[in-house]
Design a protein with these regions (language model features):
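Catalytic nucleophile-loop/oxyanion-hole region of alpha/beta-hydrolase
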Residues: 50-59, 70-106, 230-238
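Short beta-strand/loop motif that positions the catalytic acidic residue
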Residues: 181, 187-189, 193
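Primarily recognizes the serine-hydrolase "nucleophile elbow" in alpha/beta-hydrolase
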Residues: 90-155, 169-170
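N-terminal cap/lid segment of alpha/beta-hydrolase-fold proteins
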Residues: 1-32
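Mobile cap/lid helix-loop segments that gate and shape the active-site cleft of serine hydrolases
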Residues: 8, 142-177, 183
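C-terminal catalytic histidine-bearing segment of alpha/beta-hydrolase fold enzymes
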Residues: 202-250
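Short beta-strand element of the alpha/beta-hydrolase
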Residues: 34-43
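Conserved alpha/beta-hydrolase "acid-adjacent" motif
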Residues: 194-203
Length: 250
C-alpha cells in the first residue's frame, strides 16, 4: 500500500479476536522537518475493533495535515488490562525507535481513540511513564470511567474482569488520574450518545482544566455513538475543521 509501512496481522478471527497486535503506518509527503505522528486506537467495547471508520479511514486526513497516522490493531483484554495497554505502549516505543526512518519527531507522538479505544488512549495519557507519555490526546465519544454510575459496563468487564474491586475501577477511571504530565486534549462527542454517556467526557475535561491542562471539547447536538469518519455523521465537516484548527494551535 502506498505510504504504508508495518505489517498486517494474519489469521484474524472476528469471533475470537485471536490475532497478533500490529500497526499500519501511513506517512505524509516527505518534508525537511520531521512530522508529528498519532497512534490511532479504534473502538469496539474491548470486544472487537472498528478498524475502518475508527482507524484506517483517518489516515488521509492526518497525512493532509502533515501528520503520520499509525493505526494500532491491539489485542482484546478478556479481563487482563495489561494486554491492550502493553500493545499501546509498544506502538509508542516502536514509533520512537523508527522516528528517524519515518522522518517523525519522537517527541511529538500523540494518541487518539474512539469509545473503548479512547479509554485505552486516555489510560496511556494518564498512566504511562514519562518516557512513553504521548504529546497530545484526541478522544472521540470516550469511555473514561470504569465506575458503575457513568461507565460503560461491557468495556469495564472486558478490561478489568468480572470481579473488579471498586478500588481497581477507580484506578482506571481516568478522570481521577490526570496529573501534570497528562497531555493536552481534544474531545468530541454527541449530546445524544446513549452508548457512552457524555458525563465521561465532561468529567475528564473538568479534571484536565483543574490541572490547567490545555483542552478543547466539542459536543454536537446529535449523532449518537460510534460515528468516527462515517459520512452519515451530520457534523462530520465541522468536526474535521475543528480538529484541524486544534492541531494548528501547537
Amino acid at each position: 500500500m502506498p505510504n504504508t509501512n508495518g505489517m498486517e496481522a494474519q489469521g484474524y478471527d472476528d469471533k475470537k479476536n485471536n490475532f497478533k497486535p500490529s500497526i499500519r503506518v501511513y506517512l505524509p509527503k516527505a518534508s525537511q522537518q520531521p512530522a508529528r505522528a498519532v497512534i490511532i486506537c479504534p473502538g469496539g467495547g474491548y470486544g472487537h475493533l472498528a478498524m475502518a471508520h475508527e482507524g484506517y479511514d483517518w489516515a488521509p486526513f492526518f497525512n493532509e495535515q502533515g501528520i503520520a497516522a499509525i493505526v494500532l490493531k491491539y489485542r482484546m483484554p478478556n479481563g487482563n488490562r495489561e494486554v491492550p495497554m502493553s500493545d499501546a505502549y509498544e506502538a509508542i516505543r516502536y514509533a520512537k525507535e523508527h522516528a528517524s526512518e519515518w522522518n517523525i519527531n519522537p517527541d511529538c507522538i500523540g494518541i487518539m481513540g474512539f469509545s473503548a479505544g479512547a479509554h485505552l488512549a486516555s489510560t496511556v495519557a494518564t498512566h504511562a511513564s514519562e518516557e512513553l507519555r504521548p504529546a497530545f490526546q484526541i478522544l472521540f465519544y470516550p469511555v473514561i470511567s470504569m465506575e458503575s454510575k457513568y461507565g460503560h459496563g461491557g468495556s469495564c468487564r472486558q478490561f478489568l474482569g468480572e470481579r473488579a474491586t471498586e478500588e481497581l475501577k477507580k484506578e482506571f477511571s481516568n478522570e481521577y488520574q490526570v496529573d501534570s504530565l497528562t497531555p493536552r486534549a481534544f474531545i468530541a462527542l454527541s449530546d445524544d450518545d446513549r452508548g457512552v454517556v457524555p458525563m465521561n467526557s465532561i468529567r475528564y475535561y473538568s479534571a484536565l482544566k483543574e490541572k490547567e491542562i490545555p483542552a478543547a471539547m466539542y459536543i454536537y447536538p446529535s449523532g449518537g455513538h460510534g460515528w468516527g469518519m462515517k459520512d452519515s455523521f451530520k457534523f462530520r465537516n465541522e468536526m474535521l475543521m475543528e480538529l484541524k484548527a486544534w492541531l494548528m494551535t501547537f
